[in-house]
């Protein structure tokens, strides 16, 4: 689920792990979700939201695992906690405090969920990655994310893809299920349009305003029939159909579908496959502007390829 460490000398080796739905309500379950990734490397920093940081720290204490904790607005700027971190190699840090405390580069990072402001996540990854290249080392990233967090799943999948990490099957399936890219939706709409355009639609003669030629029963003085004269066909009564399912065949068994209904159907398909606007709230991740958060960010990376 990550890059092969033999293929590069520095950078990030990322893995994503599934968090069960119940993990959001139990302190012990929060700890159990990250237990297997603690202590695998010499130094580890657990990154989480402010409310979770205290709970995880208390759980570590109960497990007799000495650790440091970094929060925003610490009295001494976190000097004492930094000293403990150099000694024990394990720290719990809130997302808001990560940029303030200026911790040294760790061997591994555990993201327990993503920041509530998901825009901060790619910026944090870029900062860690930049330091890893500078120190010429591989840093391990473990991301524990809930399967119910649609936006977080989408952001994580793009970060894995952009760094050529293997995207787990369950992540890819969730992205397709919950966060189908707009390009796929537009492609589906075009396929529907092409399919409908290839189906011939019968057009009645009356619709073309054509007239039928019928022989006249009037005879001349000599008794010979007179030349036929064009007689307009009887005008058919228009039937207004509210739905395509109400259309019935004519006397010849043919169906005539009004053009307006075809256009209506295409427009309805547009609505059916258009992206859900409810997902595009103010908290949704802005992928196009993600590259501008850091002056050193490689603008060659794109989130939608």
From Swiss-Prot:
Keyword Nucleus: yes
Keyword annotations: Nucleus, RNA-mediated gene silencing
Biased composition (Basic and acidic residues): 289-305
GO terms, biological process: regulatory ncRNA-mediated gene silencing
Tissue spec. comment: Expressed throughout the male and female germline.
Disruption phenotype: Mortal germline (Mrt) phenotype in which there is a progressive decline in fertility with each generation at 25 degrees Celsius, and after 2 to 3 generations the brood size is 25% that of wild-type counterparts. Fertility in these mutants may be restored when transferred to a 20 degrees Celsius environment. Defective RNAi inheritance.
Record region (Disordered): 211-233, 267-305
Record bears the keyword Nucleus: yes
Coiled-coil region list: none
Organism domain of life: Eukaryota
GO CC annotation: nucleus
Biased composition (Acidic residues): 268-287
Compartments in which it is found: Nucleus
Residue spans of biased composition, Polar residues class: 215-227
Protein role: Plays a role in germline RNA interference (RNAi), and in particular is required for piwi-interacting RNA (piRNA) gene silencing. Facilitates the binding of the argonaut protein hrde-1 to small interfering RNAs (siRNAs) targets that are required for transgenerational epigenetic inheritance and germline immortality.
Name of the protein in its database record: Protein hrde-2
């Amino acid at each position: 689920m990550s890059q092969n460490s033999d293929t590069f000398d520095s950078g990030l080796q990322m893995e994503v792990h599934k968090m069960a739905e119940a993990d959001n309500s139990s302190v012990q379950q929060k700890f159990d979700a990250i237990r297997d990734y603690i202590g695998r490397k010499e130094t580890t920093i657990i990154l989480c939201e402010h409310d979770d940081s205290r709970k995880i720290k208390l759980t570590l204490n109960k497990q007799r695992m000495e650790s440091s904790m970094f929060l925003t607005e610490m009295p001494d700027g976190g000097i004492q906690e930094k000293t403990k971190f150099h000694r024990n190699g394990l720290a719990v840090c809130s997302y808001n405090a990560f940029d303030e405390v200026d911790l040294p580069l760790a061997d591994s990072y555990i993201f327990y969920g993503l920041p509530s402001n998901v825009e901060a996540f790619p910026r944090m990854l870029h900062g860690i990655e930049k330091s890893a290249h500078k120190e010429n080392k591989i840093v391990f990233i473990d991301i524990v994310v809930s399967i119910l967090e649609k936006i977080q799943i989408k952001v994580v999948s793009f970060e894995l893809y952009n760094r050529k990490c293997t995207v787990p099957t369950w992540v890819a399936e969730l992205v397709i299920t919950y966060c189908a890219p707009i390009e796929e939706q537009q492609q589906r709409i075009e396929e529907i349009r092409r399919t409908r355009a290839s189906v011939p639609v019968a057009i009645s003669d009356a619709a073309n305003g054509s007239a039928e030629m019928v022989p006249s029963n009037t005879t001349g003085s000599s008794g010979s029939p007179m030349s036929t004269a064009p007689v307009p066909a009887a005008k058919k009564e228009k039937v207004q159909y509210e739905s395509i399912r109400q259309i019935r065949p004519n006397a010849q068994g043919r169906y005539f579908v009004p053009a307006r209904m075809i256009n209506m159907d295409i427009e309805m398909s547009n609505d059916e496959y258009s992206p859900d606007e409810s997902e595009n709230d103010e908290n949704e991740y802005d992928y196009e502007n993600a590259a501008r958060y850091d002056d050193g960010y490689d603008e060659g990376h794109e989130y939608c390829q």
